Each structure stands twice: as C-alpha cells, then as structure tokens.
C-alpha cells in the first residue's frame, strides 16, 4: 500500500513539473520601442556648403511593408524635433556670426532721405490719385511691362534714414564722425523737446547681442534626408488618410532613411516642399487648431520675388579690428522697394483648400465655403507674424499680404505684394535673439514653388470660419517628416515554454530566410510568434549582418568626410551614430551574458514563468503585440534571470570544488595543507565538545537516580521530603516507584522529584502527540486507501468494459469478414459457373454447325 501511495505522489509531482512553464529568452525577435537617438543626414548637394553638414547620399534605400498597427504623431515626434533643431543650426552656420556690434548702441542724429527731385514725389502722388482702377488693380505675369521695370502700381521706394554718430577707436582720445544709412524699420527714434533734435538708436540694441557675418554668405536651401543609426529604424505611416495624428495606423512601412526634404525658413507659406501631391490634404494638431495644409501641385503655385539693385556696399572701420559693412546710397536717392508676385491658379487652389477643410473629420465649423475665408494675423504681432517673412538670397523680405488676401477673395486684381527689407530680424527658433545680416549689392531675385500653407483654423457658431496664416516655421517640418517615427530595435524577447534548461527541445523544421539587409530582420514583424520564432536564428544573423553593413557604410562616408568633420555639428552626430550602434549590440550581448544566454538565439532557463494566466498565442499573435503585454514584467524577469544565473555559477563553482577531489594527487597538494590543519583543529574541538556533552548527560542521569555530584551542596542544605510508602499499595505503583518491594521510608530530594514530574509530563505530552499523529496518519491512510480501492475498482470495471467492447468489436469485424468472404466466394463461384456455361456454348458452336451440315446433307 505504501508503494502505491509513493507512486501516486511521484505521478502528481511529474504532472506538476510538466505543467510548469519556464522563461525562454529569444534573441532576434522583430520588436521595437520608441527612441530619441540623434539621426544623421545624407545629401546629394555636393557643390554647396551643405556638403560639409551632411554625408554623401547614395540613394540605396528600401522600404518593407509591415503587417502591424502603430501610433503616429507629427507634433510629438523626435524626427521632426531634430529636423527643426538641425535646420536652425544649418541656418546659423550659413551666416557664421562672429563680430559683436555692441559699439553701435550709441545715440545717432538722423534725418529721413528724400527723392532726388520733387518730380518723383509729385508723380508718385499723382499716380496714386489719378490712375484708373484698371491700371491700379491689374494681374501681372512675366510679360507685363511693369514687372520688368519694377514700377507696378503701388510699389514705391524703400524707406531709409541718414544718421550721423561719433566713435572713438582709431586714434586715442580722438573722436571721428561717421555717416550711416539705415532702413527706417531698423532704428527707433525719439525727439528731445529741449533741443528739438531727433536721436535714434539701433532697434533691439539694449535687449540682444547683434552679430554681423564675417563673410557674406547666401542662405541656399539644400535637400537632404535623415537616416537612422544601425540598430534603429524609421517607421512610416503609408495611409493616405493620415492627418498628422493616428493612434492606429495599419499601413506601416519600415526604412533606414526618410525621403528627401528641403530646408525651409518662411512664414505663412512653405516653399519647395517634397510632400506635394495631386490632392490637397491637411495635417491637424491633435489638441488644438494648428494646421499645415499641403497644396495641390496641379495648380502650379509659385512665388517670384525681386529686389532692384541700385545700392553698393562699403566698409566702415569703427575701431581697431572691427569692420562694419554699411549700405551706401547716393545722396538724396532711396533704393527701390522689393516686391513679390504670385503665379499659378491660386484662386482654384484656395477654393480646394476650403472644400478640403469642410470635409476634414476634425472640422466643426460651417460647411458653406462662402463663409470660409483667409485672414491675416492680428495687428500688433511681431513683423514675422504680421508680414510674410522669407529669405531671398540672404536678404530677408517682409511682405504685406493685404493685396494677396483681397486678390484670392476676388476683391482686387493685384496678384503681387510690396515687401521691405530688414537688417535686424527676430529668430524663428529661439525667442529673443536677433541676427544682423549684411546688405548685398546688385539685383536679387528668387523663384520658389509654394507647396503648403501654415494656418490656424478658427470658427465661431458655425457661421464664419477663418483660415488665419501663421508664423510657426516649425510646422513645415512636421508636414515633411510627420509621418515618420524613430524606433529602437529590441531583439530580445521573453515567452513561456515548457522546456527547461538542459532539456532537449522539440525538433523544428528549418525555414529559409531571404537576407534583405537590416530591414530584412523586420520583414517578419507582422507574422505570428510561432512562425517568427522558427526563423529566429537566421533573423539574429540577419540583424548582426545588417548592423555590420550599416556600420561599414557609415564608416566609409565618415572617412570621405573626415577632413570636413572638424568644425561641423553634424560630424559629432555621425560619429555618435556609429558608436551608438556598437554600444547597443554590446549592451544586448551583455544582458544575454548576465542571463547565461550569450550568443544563443533560443535560451531555455530554470526561472518559472511569473504569470500563468498570461500566455502567448503562437499562431495568431505577433511578437510586437506580445511585447506590449509583457513589457511591465521585463524588469522582474530580468532580475530573476540574473539571480538564477548567479546561483547557477555558485553551483558550478561548488561542483568544480568537488571535482578537485577526484584526482589523488590533489590530496597531497601543498596548497591544501592549511585546510588539512584547519580540519584537524575542528575535529579536536568537536571531540572535546562531545566529551563535555557526554559528561553533562551522565551527570543528569545520575541526578535522576538520586545521586549527587561531588561538588554538590552539603546534605544539611537540601530539604528532605518524608515519603511514607504503604505496603498494601498495588504492584504497578511499586513498579512505578522503581520496584517498591523494599518498603519502608524513603527520602527524595524535592528538586529531583520535581524534575521527575516535569519529565513525566513531557513524556505524556509527547505520547499523546504521537498517538494523535498516528491516528491522523492511519485515518488519512485509510481514506486514501479507500479512494485508491474505489479508483482501482472503477478503472478495473472500465477496463473490463473496454476489453469486452474491444472483444465484441473484434468478433463483429471477424463476423463481417467471414460474411464478406463467403459472399465473395459464392459470387465468384456463380460467376465461374456462368462463364463456364458460356465457354461451353462457344466451344459447342462448331460441333453444332457440323451436326447441322450433316443433317442437311442427309
């Protein structure tokens, strides 16, 4: 019976062990998480200053479609934020500020410039008052005479002001007077009532540091793309309905680099963008009404700006080592005003913008496009907000867009806008900084393709909607790169399996994997976990090969640019991208090594799975979906794996220590003699302690028998208890009192009797506990025996029924076989008889013919 119980316990333990799931580490699974690592850029502009900012572009980039769902946000996006920051640095690099012009914070005596003759002013005022509306409000093109002569209606001369100021610097304690011509918008003047003189200062003189370029540089836009470092990837939402915010984009592609983009610095409009399509679509902020509207390229919208060139540039030596570039005009002559004109089907494009806005799911205003209008920002804003601000070959233009807004609303016919130039501008990225740009000689002209509109959508009571132009330059890059997101490849995954470490794994069919470089690793991201895990070995090799390939490509381009990387911001980013990839791979291998899984694609462990209710669906769930469910368990799993590995290393160390005793020569090793001496001392101490224990036990045993040790107290100090024993007392009492046949009076020391009493009580307690435990075990055994007998009888009965059923089925099959055999035999015999008769009949035909012939002849 005990053997049967032991077998049942072993079977239950085996079932428990078999049902326990253990943590299995997979290396090479297609999973990722959001990342903020710096990107590096690549460009094909090899002949401009931008080539020292980015690496050469080889155009060898591919995209792989993923069967996954991912969240995208153009405004909460590290790719767009890096683009905004980097373009700002490119902008700063292009003008290279180096000289602080703080000496110009001096009082200047200024007077406004006048025309050379009074005829210009008269003709100007006359033309303003006497021209017909047809002449004033005409739409111009390339062939319009006023466009070629820069004298279209409404365009005048740039407002300038002549100033004089004194500076000390070239000669000690000697002042020198300088004459300078400023744009009137770059100075602020105040009138002294006591002297009736006008004193002017440079604008923003006391609030910012103004810098001038050491050399004259143009802000030439460059086209470039961002690339992810090895070990990282870029995901793109390929859904045409994507509007800047999509929590569940189901059309996702993976790539190593973005599309080409162009550096843009302008307000109101975006120029030369790469996202223009044959449709109009809107990117809308997820929490407010900020939008960026991509215009339909079908309408061929463009902007042509021009500044007539009738000024020269001269150098003014302010003090030793400080040179100031001043724009010099002939006396009493002001420069012509800059202006821009709009080409293309602008009215049709703006009407399509209104219709697209009315259909947008985020829009809650009126659907009547007649009540949707374009509006300028409110008055009192910064010049970059109130005017359209753009850069034309180094000069910053501030264009008054009132005529343009009236033109697209069919209120006027002027498709051009007057502009003025400022030398001191507000920066578009960092608030409160001003950059001084030197003037330029000659005529300036620039042509740009208009691809987007920066605007805020405002509506009230479903009656009127305003599309207000905005000065958020950063929105341009959210349109360019807002459908991308940067992710870090996390090839280490955890999943529960029944295999334990050192157990044999089930055989798996080997599947081939097409090596597609680094992105080939992500090709199985949309596959089920089971299918992806079958190719995990090949995927890990593809991952490593892709990282090495990207490292080599990056190293090659860095080598080609090593001379130009000394003074650029991008150089450090490129080198950081290379170092980051190596660190990431080493970090993954370090984690695997801490778990005892170094350089293993599938690693079984002895750590039990922490949550039995959480199990993967190997046939229908992707690794990315599974990773999202177990991400909160990764810290605990990692800690448990590290502890298990530490314990494993300790066990291996102890095992190696035991293995050292297998060699007989190690017993006589000199390094072991100290241990031998230590063991001898411990043995001696143990023997002495054992002797002490034995002596104490013997002493207690003598005390129990009534003896006193030699060093005990004198008898007079021990109180004696007189115990009278009755001779008629039962024999069992005599036996209990150690015989009792001696009779008479006996004297017991009362401490010894008390000890005997305690010992008897302890014996009774232990006896009772023993009896209770024995009864409990016996009853449990009887209960288990009864259950076992009933289970055995039930199994025996079911086995008998099954055996009887099998015998009955066997007999039925045998009977069916006999019947079939007899039926087939009878059928064969009957068929044989029929065939035999037919054969005999055929054989008898000649005989019958002969007999008939004989009868006929007779």
Swiss-Prot record:
Spans annotated as V1: 110-162
Transmembrane segments: 680-700
Region (MPER): 657-678
One example GO MF annotation: structural molecule activity
Domain of life: Viruses
Signal peptide bounds: 1-19
Region: V4, residue numbers: 399-419
CDD domains: HIV-1-like_HR1-HR2
Miscellaneous notes: Some HIV-2 isolates have been described that can infect cells independently of CD4, using CXCR4 as primary receptor. These isolates may have an exposed coreceptor binding site.
Entry protein name: Envelope glycoprotein gp160
Organism expressing this protein natively: Human immunodeficiency virus type 2 subtype A (isolate ROD)
């Amino acid at each position: 019976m005990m053997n049967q119980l032991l077998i049942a316990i072993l079977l239950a333990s085996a079932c428990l062990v078999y049902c326990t799931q253990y943590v299995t580490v997979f290396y090479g699974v297609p999973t990722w998480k959001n990342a903020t690592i710096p990107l590096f850029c690549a460009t094909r502009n090899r002949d401009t200053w931008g080539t020292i900012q980015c690496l050469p572009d080889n155009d060898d980039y591919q995209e792989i479609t993923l069967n996954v769902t991912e969240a995208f946000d153009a405004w909460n996006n590290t790719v767009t934020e890096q683009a905004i920051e980097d373009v700002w640095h490119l902008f700063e690099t292009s003008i290279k500020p180096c000289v602080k012009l703080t000496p110009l914070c001096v009082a200047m005596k200024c007077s406004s410039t006048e025309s050379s003759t009074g005829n210009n002013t008269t003709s100007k005022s006359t033309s303003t008052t006497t021209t017909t509306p047809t002449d004033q409000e005409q739409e111009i093109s390339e062939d319009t005479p006023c466009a070629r002569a820069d004298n279209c209606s409404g365009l005048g001369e740039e407002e300038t002001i002549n100033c004089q100021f004194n500076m000390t610097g070239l000669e000690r304690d000697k002042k020198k007077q300088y004459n300078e011509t400023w744009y009137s918008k770059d100075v602020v003047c105040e009138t002294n009532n006591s002297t009736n003189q006008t004193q002017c200062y440079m604008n923003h003189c006391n609030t910012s540091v103004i810098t001038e370029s050491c050399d004259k540089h143009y802000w030439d836009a460059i086209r470039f793309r961002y690339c992810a470092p090895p070990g990282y990837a870029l995901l793109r939402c390929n859904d045409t309905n994507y509007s800047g915010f999509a929590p569940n984009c189901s059309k996702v592609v993976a790539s190593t680099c973005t599309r080409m983009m162009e550096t843009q610095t302008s307000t109101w409009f975006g120029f030369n963008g790469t996202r223009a399509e044959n449709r109009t679509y809107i990117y809308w902020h997820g929490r407010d009404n900020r939008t960026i509207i991509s215009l339909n390229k079908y309408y061929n919208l463009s902007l042509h700006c021009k500044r007539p060139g009738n000024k020269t540039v001269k150098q003014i030596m302010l003090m030793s080592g400080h040179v100031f570039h001043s724009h010099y005009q002939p006396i009493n002559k002001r420069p012509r005003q800059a202006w821009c004109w709009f080409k293309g089907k602008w009215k049709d494009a703006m009407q399509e913008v209104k219709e697209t806005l009315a259909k947008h799911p985020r829009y809650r205003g009126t659907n009547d496009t007649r009540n949707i209008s374009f509006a300028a920002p409110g008055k009192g804003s910064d010049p970059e907000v109130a005017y359209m601000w753009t850069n034309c070959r180094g000069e910053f233009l501030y264009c008054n867009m009132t005529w343009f807004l009236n033109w697209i609303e069919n209120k006027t016919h002027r498709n051009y806008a007057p502009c003025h130039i400022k030398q001191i501008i507000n920066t578009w990225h960092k608030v409160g900084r001003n950059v001084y740009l030197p003037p330029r000689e000659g005529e300036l002209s620039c042509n740009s393709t208009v691809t987007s509109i920066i605007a805020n959508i405002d509506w009230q009571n479903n009656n009127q909607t305003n599309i207000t132009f905005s000065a958020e330059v950063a929105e341009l890059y959210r349109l360019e790169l807002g459908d991308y997101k940067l992710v870090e490849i996390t090839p280490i995954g955890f999943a529960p399996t029944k295999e334990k470490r050192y157990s044999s794994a089930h055989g798996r069919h080997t599947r081939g994997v097409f090596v597609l470089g680094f992105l080939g690793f992500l090709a199985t991201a949309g596959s089920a976990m089971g299918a992806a895990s079958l190719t995990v070995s090949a995927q890990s090799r593809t991952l490593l090969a892709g990282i090495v390939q990207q490292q080599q490509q990056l190293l090659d381009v860095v080598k080609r640019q090593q001379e130009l990387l000394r003074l650029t911001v991008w150089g450090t980013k490129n080198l950081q991208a290379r170092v980051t990839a190596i660190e990431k791979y080493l970090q993954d291998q370090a984690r695997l090594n801490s778990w005892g899984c170094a350089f293993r694609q599938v690693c079984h462990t002895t750590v039990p799975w922490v949550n039995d209710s959480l199990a993967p669906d190997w046939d229908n769930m992707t690794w990315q979906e599974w990773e999202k469910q177990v991400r909160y368990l990764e810290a605990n799993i990692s800690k448990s794996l590290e502890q298990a590995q530490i314990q494993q290393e300790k066990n291996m160390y102890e095992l190696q220590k035991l293995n050292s005793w297998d060699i007989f020569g190690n017993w006589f090793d000199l390094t072991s003699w100290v241990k031998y001496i230590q063991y001898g001392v411990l043995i001696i101490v143990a023997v002495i302690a054992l002797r002490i224990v034995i002596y104490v036990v013997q002493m207690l045993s003598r005390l129990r028998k009534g003896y006193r040790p030699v060093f005990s107290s004198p008898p007079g100090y021990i109180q004696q208890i007189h115990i009278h024993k009755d001779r008629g007392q039962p024999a069992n009492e005599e036996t209990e009192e150690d015989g009792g046949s001696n009779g008479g009076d006996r004297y017991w020391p009362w401490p010894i009797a008390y000890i005997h009493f305690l010992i008897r009580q302890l014996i009774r307690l232990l006896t009772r506990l023993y009896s209770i435990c024995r009864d409990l075990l016996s009853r449990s055994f009887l209960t288990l025996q009864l259950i076992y007998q009933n289970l055995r009888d039930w199994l025996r009965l079911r086995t008998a029924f099954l055996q009887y059923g099998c015998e009955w089925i066997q007999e039925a099959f045998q009977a069916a076989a006999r019947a079939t055999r007899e039926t087939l035999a009878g059928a064969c015999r009957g068929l044989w008889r029929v065939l035999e008769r037919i054969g005999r009949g055929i054989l008898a035909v000649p005989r019958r013919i002969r007999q008939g012939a004989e009868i006929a002849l007779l």
